[in-house]
Amino acid sequence: MAATVNYFEIGTPDSAAAQQFYGGLFGWQIDEPSPVGYRMLDGGAGGLWDTTALGGAAWAIFYVGVEDVQATIAKAEALGAKVLLPLIDNGAIEFAHLADPQGNRFGIWRPKTPAG
């Protein structure tokens, strides 16, 4: 996987207000929330994450596809990044959130290969 920006996400403690704002502003179709409060935006181009369980932070973030999330975390830390959300494996993807040395939040991710 080339290291390209290929997904975005909006984190919010008020997903109903975010849905109203972004749906109204850009005409995005926003799916009903999953059991963990995640909504797909505009056919999967991005996501809206209810961050209440994560302390209620708000963010806008871009994701870069990588071959190895853990190795990329280590490389980023060596270059001065901080881990904001450690590697999460949700069964379909692995991802993490980091902050660059200037404090900008970004994500890295990779799809999981189906077993078999």
Residue spans of the language-model regions?
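N-terminal first-folded block
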Residues: 7-41
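Short beta-strand micro-motifs in enzyme catalytic cores
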Residues: 6, 37-39, 60, 94-96
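N-terminal beta-strand motif that seeds the catalytic metal site of vicinal oxygen chelate
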Residues: 1-19, 44-45, 59-64, 111-116
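Short, conserved charged micro-motifs
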Residues: 16-17, 69-73
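Conserved short beta-strand elements that form part of the metal-binding/catalytic scaffold
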Residues: 27-59, 105-111
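Vicinal oxygen chelate
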Residues: 3, 10, 73, 79-116
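Conserved active-site tyrosine of GNAT-family acetyltransferases
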Residues: 18-22, 76, 103
